[in-house]
Amino acid sequence: MARQTPITRYRNIGISAHIDAGKTTTTERILFYTGVSHKIGEVHDGAATMDWMEQEQERGITITSAATTCFWSGMGNQFPQHRINVIDTPGHVDFTIEVERSMRVLDGACMVYCAVGGVQPQSETVWRQANKYKVPRLAFVNKMDRTGANFFRVVEQMKTRLGANPVPIVVPIGAEDTFTGVVDLIEMKAIIWDEASQGMKFEYGEIPADLVDTAQEWRTNMVEAAAEASEELMDKYLEEGDLSKEDIIAGLRARTLASEIQVMLCGSAFKNKGVQRMLDAVIEFLPSPTEVKAIEGILDDKDETKASREASDEAPFSALAFKIMNDKFVGNLTFVRVYSGVLKQGDAVYNPVKSKRERIGRIVQMHANERQDIDEIRAGDIAACVGLKDVTTGDTLCDEKNIITLERMEFPDPVIQLAVEPKTKADQEKMSIALGRLAKEDPSFRVHTDEESGQTIIAGMGELHLDIIVDRMKREFGVEANIGKPMVAYRETIKKTVEQEGKFVRQTGGKGKFGHVYVRLEPLDVEAAGKEYEFAEEVVGGVVPKEFFGAVDKGIQERMKNGVLAGYPVVGVKAVLFDGSYHDVDSDELSFKMAGSYAFRDGFMKADPVLLEPIMKVEVETPEDYMGDIMGDLNRRRGMVQGMDDLPGGTKAIKAEVPLAEMFGYATQMRSMSQGRATYSMEFAKYAETPRNVAEGIIAKFQAGGKKGDDE
C-alpha cells in the first residue's frame, strides 16, 4: 500500500498547557474542525473525547496523553490535505513524566495559555522540557471570552517568565464578552467566525477602526521578526519597507523551526473562535518529520558507534515505544512513533534494549479511545501496536538486520512511597498483576517489596499520582486495597573522607574464608559526576588480586541499598579500594564481598554521615488577603520562601522550597486557610541535608527497631 499523505505534509504535534488553560477543550475543537468528532465534547460535562480514562473525566484533568490522527486542509481549504497527529499531554505536575515522554516523540508543540491566568508554574515546567528536546512551538492564548482576559499581558509574561520570544500573528478584536474574532496580521483583515455553524465557516472583513493602529504596530513587529530570518529578507525589507505574505510566512517558519521565535495566536476554544486559525499556523509554521534533526542512536557493534535514521520510508525500520496502555478488550497497546522505514501487520521487530524479537499482531490508529485497524505504518506515523509482550516505555523497536538503539528516555526517581495491601487474601495475586501492569505503563511509578516487613511498597511522583494508581487498581483490575501513610524517600550520604579496614575471616575445619581490604570513602558530588556512586581501585603490587575487585564493589553496593544510619539508600559516595591482603586457599569472591561490605559499614559511620530529604519546589497562588497566613504556614513547614510575584486581580504567587515530609495533607490545610481560593503546584527540586533535630528522630526510631519511613 503506497503512502497516502507525503511525509512533508505530516505534523506531529503536542498540545501542552497548565491545568485549566482549556487544553482539552482546544484539542476537542481540533478534532471537531478536522471532521473526526461530530458532537463537541465539553470537559464541563465530563464528556471530552481525549480525556478517555474515567478518573480524568471525574477529576477534570488530563492524565494520559492519548494520540489522535486527523486531517486539515486549512480554514479556507487553501492547503493540500495535511495529516496531523495530536498528542494531548497532561497539565498536572504529578504527571510531568507524561509530558516529558510525549516531548520526546513530537516534532512541534502548541502551548495553550489562559488569557486570564497567563503563564503559570506548570507552563514553566513544560517550557523547560520543550527546550530540553528543542521542540519548535507556537502559543495559543485561550479563554479570550473570560472576564479579565488580556492577550498582550500574556505576550509580556512569555517574555519575562519563560524568556521566550513571542511574535503575535493575530490580535484580538475585543476581549471578555465583547471578544468577536481576530485580526490576521499577515492578511491584515479581520476574521469573524460564524456562530451558527459552531465556527466551521468564517468570513474576512475590514479591521475595526479603533484597532487599525494597534494592528499596524504589531504587524510591523511581526514583519521585522520575519526579516531577521535571512540577509536576503532583511535587504528586501529595508528596500521596500514591507514583505510579501509568502516572505513573511517563510521568514517566521525558518525562525520557528530554529526555536528563535514562537508565533502567537489567540481565541476562545469554548466559543469556537480561533482554533481554526491556530490549525493553519500548525501547517504554516511547525515542522514536518523531515524538517527536524534526524533521530540519533547507537549501533549494535563493539564501539557503540553513533548513527542516525533519516525520516524516510526507504531507511531501515526504527521506532520508539513511548507509551504502553492496558486495554480491557485487546490487552497491551504499545504506542510507537516511527522514525524511519515501514512496518506491516505481522512483521517481526527487534527490541535491542531487551535483546528480543517480537511479532506485531495488529496495528491500530487511535482516535482518543476509538481505534481503527490499519495495515502498515511508515516514517512519521504515530500508532499503537497490539501483541507486543516484552516492551517497556522508552524501548526501541527496529529492523533485525539493521539494529539501532535510539536514545533512551530518562525518568526521575519517585519521591513519595506508601505501603499497599489487598483487602482480602484472594486479591493478593490480582494486586501483583495490576501493579506490574501499571508499572510497565508508567516508568515514574515503581513497585518493590520491603525486605524487612514483606510489605508491597508503591512509589511515585506525588500524592495525586499514587491516588490515581490506587484508583486504577480498583477500577480496571477490581482490586480493593488498604493503603498506609505516605512515606518520604530519604537518602543517606557522607560529608568527609575516611579510610577504613574491612576484614572477613572464618576458620572452620577444612577450607576457611579470608578477605581483607582497605577502602577510602569520599563524598561525591552527584550532580557534577552525573552518578550516585563511583568505585575505583589504587591497589599496588597485587595485594588484592584483580579478580576480587568486582566482589568488593558489589559488597559495598549491596550495603548501600539499606544505609547504615536509618536504613535508607546511600548516595554521593566514591569508594576507592587501595590496599588489603589475601590468602591463597581461603580467599574467594564471597570473602571479599563481605570485607567490602564491612569496610563500608564501619567507615560510613566515621565519615560524618547525614540524612538527606527531598525538597519540593512549591508555588502557591493566593488572593492577597490570605497571603500572611499562607506564608506563616509555609515557614512552620520549614519552608524557605524564594520570592513573590504579583498576578492579575490582586493575586500573589509565592515561590518556596519546602521539605516533602512537611507537605503531606497540605492541600486540605491550604484550602481551609484561603476558603478554597488558593491553589498550589509542587515538583521535586533537590535533595538537601535534613536538620539535625528532625534527623535524630528518624534515626532513633530506626535504631529502636522501628521501620524506616514510619516517621510522622
UniProtKB/Swiss-Prot annotation:
Please state which protein family the record places this protein in.
Belongs to the TRAFAC class translation factor GTPase superfamily. Classic translation factor GTPase family. EF-G/EF-2 subfamily.
Organism ancestry: Bacteria, Pseudomonadati, Pseudomonadota, Gammaproteobacteria, Moraxellales
- Boundaries of each tr-type G domain copy? 8-290
Record-level GO cellular component terms = cytoplasm
Concerning InterPro entries, the annotation shows: EFG_II, EFG_III, EFG_III/V, EFG_IV, EFG_V, EFG_V-like, EFTu-like_2, G_TR_CS
Molecular function per GO: GTP binding; GTPase activity; guanosine tetraphosphate binding; translation elongation factor activity
> Could you identify this protein by its name?
Elongation factor G
Q: Which organism is it from?
A: Acinetobacter baumannii (strain ATCC 17978 / DSM 105126 / CIP 53.77 / LMG 1025 / NCDC KC755 / 5377)
Q: Where does GTP bind?
A: 17-24, 88-92, 142-145
